[in-house]
Swiss-Prot record:
This is Beta/delta-urticatoxin-Ui2a. Expressed in trichomes, that are stiff epidermal hairs located on the surface of petioles and leaves. Its main location: secreted. The lineage of its organism: Eukaryota, Viridiplantae, Streptophyta, Embryophyta, Tracheophyta. One of its GO terms (molecular function) is sodium channel regulator activity. The presence of 'disulfide through disulfide knots' structurally defines this protein as a knottin. This toxin contains 2 'disulfide through disulfide knots'.
Length: 135
């Protein structure tokens, strides 16, 4: 199951970088000029386009691949280097990797923003699933 998910995520990353510069420039120009007619179908296509074109989403996928420990694997301790260019191991819970390529294992302290990939330090909880504050 985990291998299937990994292959799907890697396909998403590969396909998101497959667009040529010309296609990207055309999409940017279209968005700036506002030459669209909107409908429910447009909203869905915009969402799908965003998943494949937006480099922020590609970075999010890479962070997900590098930031979490695998079952029964040794993990990277708090404050130690992490990321897919540094180690094949994820950070120990509740830490996450501060950058997907080369970062440090950190956690979110009390009163700071937390969410989907930014976990609160031990003993704290996030009051939101995607955007919240550590309490």
């Amino acid at each position: 199951m985990g291998a299937i998910v990994l292959v799907a995520i890697m396909a998403l990353v590969a396909s998101s970088s497959a667009f040529s510069d010309d296609e990207q420039n055309m999409m940017n120009a279209e968005g700036e000029k506002g030459i669209r007619s909107y409908s429910a179908a447009d909203d869905v296509s915009d969402m799908i386009e965003s998943l494949f074109v937006n480099s922020g989403n590609r970075n999010l996928v890479l962070m997900m691949l590098s930031g979490r420990p695998q079952p029964n694997a040794r993990c990277v301790e708090d404050g130690q280097p992490c990321g897919f260019l540094v180690s094949d191991k994820g950070c120990c819970l509740p830490n996450y990797c501060s950058q997907y390529a080369r970062g440090k294992c950190i956690c979110v302290p009390k009163g700071q923003p937390c969410g989907l990939l930014h976990f609160c330090c031990l003993g704290l909880t996030c009051d939101g699933s995607f955007q919240g504050t550590c309490n």
